[in-house]
Amino acid sequence: MIVYKGSIQPSMVCETPAVYKGNLWKRLSQSKFRSSFSLKANDRSYVSEKGMEKVREHACDFIRKRLAPAEIPNDGKQTPMRGHPVFVAQHATATCCRGCLEKWHHIPKGRELTEAEQEYIVNVIMEWIGREIH
């Protein structure tokens, strides 16, 4: 399994430069729904106990299995609202389903995600989690 590291940077975005031109964090903060998410005490404890690298591994696995395939039968419903810090982060960052990825990150539906896109998504999720715990 590939474990992606580092903070998101424009050079890592590859096919999705509009995210940075549109200022992702500002746009997410202006969404009532997206900005309503935060890590609860149990999520923070989980991150503290497992560590960011283990949480990153989980994020890579979730993205590879739940978002990367070209066709997802339950798209829009595949990411629980709670139960893991990565799930919460996915909703907060609009990386929860292919529809949200298309709308917010300009990553088209109907095709398999590239490794660069998966890395970008994991980096967005991990940056949000990092911002939440610090």
Model-derived features: positions:
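Sequence termini and other peripheral, non-core segments
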Residues: 1-29, 119
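Immediate flanking context of iron-sulfur cluster ligation sites
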Residues: 73-93
